């Protein structure tokens, strides 16, 4: 155990000098004596000096304090003992329920599974949310990104997916709260507790008020716990299927940006760290499914100023199997979930994977919506009356489709007062197929707003007719 002493402190970055023959390796964890603070080595500057990031507040640190090299990277508890617990970036419990009774601890910096060990994802994962199941279906063992600006519903969508998938899914879940609001973390804990699935969820939080070092590493802590569940073989020699929820991946990038300049790196485009693509790749390449078990990850991605070409969301796009793009213009119409069906994509959109009926219905829905989008300018200038009969019909169907994409959420019951709806995939396909086939051309578009299946829309239309 070599010892060094602190020689410089700049915000979250601390320089420590060691004897030349015992300089720590990059990513080694150092413990500052008589404090709770852990430092992670980022660079070797020469002459025995290493530059580190503090995982915790550097208040109270001073020069010449002794830092001890632990000789290994940051290690966190893994295994069944983490389930039902809330931990911080170092795996320490923050739920006041005593120490974490874990049988093992793993380092958070690990290699991604080799190419031979990985297995492709083709099995569909039903979410019960119409617009997602139809337009950008998820794969079991795939990676999903929820893209959206501030206040368009990323976290609510994430919570609904957790509600619909994690509760129905018999496997285990890991939730990593990266730089988000503490209130949301608290809400999530109580949501899980109330629905009696807390004993299947491990929670790791590094919230907005934490120093950048914590926010930069907390995603890796959560991922390491998920990897353990995936890789640890049970009596049948198989790992588990794990759900990994990350809210929010953008804050991971942002924490890297905050420490990058302090580490002496030149900023790149828009002030991001020059290592942005590599940092994102290191995290994303580990979130994958192997022949042993699977990790299905759902990540919320904040889009700064609603600009999808910003380097951070643009870098994230490359790693995902499905992208769900939330649109402010759709949210402003009062249609929730505010998913943009023309901007959301999925690699599963292949007739050989999802079946011909699903694929054809989705394509026709997309064509109808695209036609409506093109006609919007004409409608704005000349009005609906100038359109041909065929175009009027397309517009009418597109508006019904838009409204039918809305649906009441279980997690929003408290605010909306209407009970949440889970719509099975076959009902979703049947409903949209009927709309594009013109079976419901006679119903008013308002009947399709905030309902579950197509039967509810028909029922709502009847009630509206009776009132009229």
Curated annotation (Swiss-Prot):
<comment type="function">
    <text>Produces ATP from ADP in the presence of a proton gradient across the membrane. The catalytic sites are hosted primarily by the beta subunits.</text>
</comment>
<dbReference type="InterPro" id="IPR005722">
    <property type="entry name" value="ATP_synth_F1_bsu"/>
</dbReference>
<keyword id="KW-1278">Translocase</keyword>
<keyword id="KW-0066">ATP synthesis</keyword>
<protein>
    <recommendedName>
        <fullName>ATP synthase subunit beta</fullName>
        <ecNumber>7.1.2.2</ecNumber>
    </recommendedName>
</protein>
<dbReference type="InterPro" id="IPR003593">
    <property type="entry name" value="AAA+_ATPase"/>
</dbReference>
<dbReference type="GO" id="GO:0046933">
    <property type="term" value="F:proton-transporting ATP synthase activity, rotational mechanism"/>
</dbReference>
<dbReference type="InterPro" id="IPR004100">
    <property type="entry name" value="ATPase_F1/V1/A1_a/bsu_N"/>
</dbReference>
<comment type="subunit">
    <text>F-type ATPases have 2 components, CF(1) - the catalytic core - and CF(0) - the membrane proton channel. CF(1) has five subunits: alpha(3), beta(3), gamma(1), delta(1), epsilon(1). CF(0) has three main subunits: a(1), b(2) and c(9-12). The alpha and beta chains form an alternating ring which encloses part of the gamma chain. CF(1) is attached to CF(0) by a central stalk formed by the gamma and epsilon chains, while a peripheral stalk is formed by the delta and b chains.</text>
</comment>
<dbReference type="InterPro" id="IPR024034">
    <property type="entry name" value="ATPase_F1/V1_b/a_C"/>
</dbReference>
<keyword id="KW-0139">CF(1)</keyword>
<keyword id="KW-0067">ATP-binding</keyword>
<dbReference type="InterPro" id="IPR027417">
    <property type="entry name" value="P-loop_NTPase"/>
</dbReference>
<keyword id="KW-0472">Membrane</keyword>
<dbReference type="InterPro" id="IPR000194">
    <property type="entry name" value="ATPase_F1/V1/A1_a/bsu_nucl-bd"/>
</dbReference>
<keyword id="KW-0406">Ion transport</keyword>
<comment type="similarity">
    <text>Belongs to the ATPase alpha/beta chains family.</text>
</comment>
<dbReference type="GO" id="GO:0045259">
    <property type="term" value="C:proton-transporting ATP synthase complex"/>
</dbReference>
<dbReference type="InterPro" id="IPR036121">
    <property type="entry name" value="ATPase_F1/V1/A1_a/bsu_N_sf"/>
</dbReference>
<dbReference type="InterPro" id="IPR050053">
    <property type="entry name" value="ATPase_alpha/beta_chains"/>
</dbReference>
<feature type="binding site">
    <location>
        <begin position="148"/>
        <end position="155"/>
    </location>
    <ligand>
        <name>ATP</name>
    </ligand>
</feature>
<dbReference type="Pfam" id="PF00006">
    <property type="entry name" value="ATP-synt_ab"/>
</dbReference>
<dbReference type="GO" id="GO:0005524">
    <property type="term" value="F:ATP binding"/>
</dbReference>
<dbReference type="InterPro" id="IPR020003">
    <property type="entry name" value="ATPase_a/bsu_AS"/>
</dbReference>
<keyword id="KW-0813">Transport</keyword>
<dbReference type="InterPro" id="IPR055190">
    <property type="entry name" value="ATP-synt_VA_C"/>
</dbReference>
<dbReference type="Pfam" id="PF22919">
    <property type="entry name" value="ATP-synt_VA_C"/>
</dbReference>
<dbReference type="GO" id="GO:0005886">
    <property type="term" value="C:plasma membrane"/>
</dbReference>
<keyword id="KW-1003">Cell membrane</keyword>
<dbReference type="Pfam" id="PF02874">
    <property type="entry name" value="ATP-synt_ab_N"/>
</dbReference>
<keyword id="KW-0375">Hydrogen ion transport</keyword>
<keyword id="KW-0547">Nucleotide-binding</keyword>
<dbReference type="GO" id="GO:0016887">
    <property type="term" value="F:ATP hydrolysis activity"/>
</dbReference>
